[in-house]
């Protein structure tokens, strides 16, 4: 009887050495995001982080999210360096809505076969997103799972924790009729609606490399999600922000009501901004109804802020100084009975 060939984990499709190489590659990206509250170094069983001492009654705010099927486009077109920014943005933009300063972030990267170069590019993007939001990348998990994913496909998930002073939590309870609504421009579709985006590409048989307003269509579609944290933290400090809505899945119709009292509705002037070209292209080439566009995509509006009408000019000036494109998009009105909570005129 012949002696069986000894098996290793690598024979089963899991390369521990590749995982170690990835950890080595990302150390600089992680170090760049370090905050003074972080304790210990990368590689521990658990990641430690103190709460900043400036908070008297700190409340922790947590969020988790992914990038959705935008990853399919990124994988197909081998554009891996920005989806990590998307991952962070989807989490930290949700935290800032409640007034929370992001503290730390952890990522989960799952794949069938670990490609160190691809994974390094992705995690470096996560580090860039954390840097943009002032958030420490303190840990994560890389799971190589042969048989679970096709080829070198991968999926991402992120988890973020932030902190806000208990007295300063923004929960929409101060929103009242007469408040103004300010919009902050998006960078593109961000990370929502990509199953519909891909369907439009399929049905229209469009060339993703075709020119749209001076750059390839695929670059518009893979533009990373804008991170609003630093500019909105300054606005919160300087103004009286009553509510914020991150325009993600569900678009205008579902996200704005999440931060409104039952007796209030948002009245939005649909002609107060021009849709970026990518949304007009999607609408035309997919024959998508306007209602569906507002339900699926941000249509050029990544964040909406509600605040007193007399604070608008100062808020717009501050946001402009922070590099944000922002404009007055509408107002809060009294809601009667079962009226819809969002009207776009």
Swiss-Prot record:
Gene3D superfamilies: PurM-like C-terminal domain, PurM-like, N-terminal domain
Cellular component annotations (GO), alphabetically ordered: cytosol
UniProt pathway annotation: Purine metabolism; IMP biosynthesis via de novo pathway; 5-amino-1-(5-phospho-D-ribosyl)imidazole from N(2)-formyl-N(1)-(5-phospho-D-ribosyl)glycinamide: step 2/2
One BP term from GO: adenine biosynthetic process
Entry GO MF terms: ATP binding; phosphoribosylamine-glycine ligase activity; phosphoribosylformylglycinamidine cyclo-ligase activity
Pfam families linked: AIRS, AIRS_C
Tagged with keyword Nucleotide-binding: yes
Entry EC no(s): 6.3.3.1
InterPro entries to which the protein is assigned, alphabetical: PurM-like_C_dom (IPR010918), PurM-like_C_sf (IPR036676), PurM-like_N (IPR016188), PurM-like_N_sf (IPR036921), PurM_cligase (IPR004733)
CDD domains cross-referenced by the UniProt entry: PurM
NCBIfam families: purM (TIGR00878)
Family (UniProt): Belongs to the AIR synthase family.
Protein name: Phosphoribosylformylglycinamidine cyclo-ligase
């Amino acid at each position: 009887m012949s002696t069986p060939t000894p098996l290793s984990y690598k024979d089963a499709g899991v390369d521990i050495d590749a995982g170690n190489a990835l950890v080595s590659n990302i150390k600089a990206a992680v170090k760049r995001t370090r905050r003074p509250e972080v304790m210990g170094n990368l590689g521990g069983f658990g990641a430690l982080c103190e709460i900043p001492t400036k908070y008297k009654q700190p409340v922790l705010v947590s969020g988790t999210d992914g990038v959705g099927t935008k990853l399919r486009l990124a994988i197909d077109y081998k554009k891996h360096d920005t989806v990590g920014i998307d991952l962070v943005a989807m989490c930290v933009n949700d935290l800032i809505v409640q007034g929370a300063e992001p503290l730390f972030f952890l990522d989960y990267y799952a794949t069938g076969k670990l490609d160190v170069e691809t994974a390094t590019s992705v995690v470096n993007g996560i580090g860039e997103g954390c840097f943009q939001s002032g958030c420490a990348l303190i840990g994560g998990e890389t799971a190589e799972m042969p048989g679970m994913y096709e080829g070198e496909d991968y999926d991402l998930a992120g988890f973020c924790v932030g902190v806000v002073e208990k007295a300063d939590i923004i929960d929409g309870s101060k929103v009242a009729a007469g408040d103004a609504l300010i919009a902050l421009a998006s960078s593109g579709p961000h990370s929502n609606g990509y199953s519909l985006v891909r369907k439009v590409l399929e049905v229209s048989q469009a060339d993703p490399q075709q020119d749209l307003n001076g750059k390839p269509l695929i670059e518009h579609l893979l533009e990373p999600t804008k991170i609003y944290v630093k500019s909105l933290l300054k606005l919160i400090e300087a103004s009286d922000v009553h509510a914020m809505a991150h325009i993600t899945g569900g678009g205008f119709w579902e996200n704005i009501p999440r931060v409104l009292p039952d007796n209030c509705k948002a009245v939005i002037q649909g002609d107060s901004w021009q849709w970026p070209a990518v949304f007009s292209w999607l609408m035309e080439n997919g024959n998508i109804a306007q209602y569906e566009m507002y339900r699926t995509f941000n249509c050029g509006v990544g964040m909406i802020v509600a605040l007193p009408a007399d604070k608008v000019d100062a808020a717009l000036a501050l946001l402009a100084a922070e590099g944000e494109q922002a404009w007055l998009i509408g107002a809060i009105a009294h809601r009667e009975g079962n009226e819809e909570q969002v009207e776009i005129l």
